[in-house]
Design a protein with these regions (language model features):
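Catalytic machinery of carbohydrate-active enzymes
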Residues: 1-318
Length: 318
């Protein structure tokens, strides 16, 4: 999900600066991120039918291809299209592996969005400096506002409890340490896979509001839009929150901000909080190494996180 959110600045600039008709290929599960985006002419949803996808895109007679994923599937697609005007993002996978295994930093000091613009640079597409985007409807906003009355008051904190891999997910016992130290109301956000953790937190802290497993990606985004502060693991919803310029306290375990996937253009007072110095913890590009009782995110500084959150909201409401 986060990868799709992070492409939106390039999509916007390609449309606005070139006047281009922009088509985007994306997995069906994440196509909603681009719904109602005025810079996207058409979304091609991929569900595994490569030949059908290729036929549909060939029918569009594309003039240029910008591959911002650079995966096996996207490489196969761009090779099959045989478009002479093609840009490809450089992912620096080898350099990430070297850092993960040996803690030797050979990575460029730049955000992945800047890498995306480098891939598009040969076409005259330049970074306009604006944030990522998701375009919500009034109906989506109204639905969550009516369903969760608590989000209509301020200030309150959105906590994104989920993550794609265990190595990026703050454990339940750490949330149990953080939440009682927060002095403002809390709203939980997550998918169906996070309902067990949400239930345990709701049982321990009855005053919190849980939207976990109840909303679509876009509806969860509508909740984040109304938050005063977001605390999130390194996950797609962290990037969605950055679309709204929210202050974000991002929590890092097996992944590191050094890889360039930190919140883009997040709000003032945002901070990236790492579980332990990178030299002493497990690092994986996707955060998918095995975790156990020694999970690095058990060592997140609960007091520091709560102090920062309380300070940010106290200053905001002063």
């Amino acid at each position: 999900m986060g990868d799709v959110v992070l492409t939106t600045p390039v999509i916007r600039c390609a449309h606005e600066q070139l006047g281009a008709e922009v088509h985007v290929v994306v997995k069906k599960a994440f196509a909603g991120i681009l719904a109602h985006n005025p810079h996207v002419h058409r979304v091609h949803e991929f569900e595994g039918d490569f030949d059908g996808l290729l036929t549909a895109i060939r029918a569009e007679n594309v003039d240029m291809v910008i591959d911002l994923h650079n995966s096996l599937r996207s490489k196969r697609l761009r090779k099959a299209l045989k478009c002479p005007n093609t840009g490809v993002v450089r992912k620096h996978s080898l350099q990430k592996w070297i850092f993960s295994e040996f803690r030797v930093n050979l990575l460029p000091d730049c955000h992945v969005v800047e890498k995306y613009f480098l891939a598009a640079g040969n076409f005259g597409i330049e970074n306009d400096g604006a944030p990522c985007e998701i375009f919500l409807t009034d109906e989506e906003r109204e639905k969550v506002a009516q369903r969760y009355q608590q989000i209509n008051s301020t200030p309150w904190i959105a906590i994104v409890i989920g993550a794609a891999h265990a190595g990026k997910q703050t454990p339940l016992k750490k949330w149990m340490e953080i939440i009682p130290k927060l002095i403002h109301p809390v709203v939980l956000i997550g998918g169906p896979e996070d309902t067990e953790m949400a239930g345990a937190l709701k049982e321990a802290f009855p005053s919190i509001v849980s939207t976990v497993g109840e909303l679509s990606i876009r509806e969860s985004a509508a909740v984040l839009e109304k938050a005063s502060l977001v605390i999130a693991n390194d996950t797609g919803m962290m990037h969605v929150a950055s679309c709204f310029g929210k202050p974000i306290l991002s929590l890092w375990g097996q992944t590191v901000p050094l890889f360039g996937m930190y919140p883009y253009k997040a709000g003032k007072a945002s901070e990236m909080i790492e579980a332990d110095p990178a030299s002493r913890r497990k690092i994986a590009k996707l955060g998918n190494k095995r975790v156990g009782s020694d999970h690095d995110m058990n060592y997140l500084p609960a007091d520091h996180i709560a102090i920062l959150a309380n300070k940010i909201l106290n200053e905001e409401s002063a």
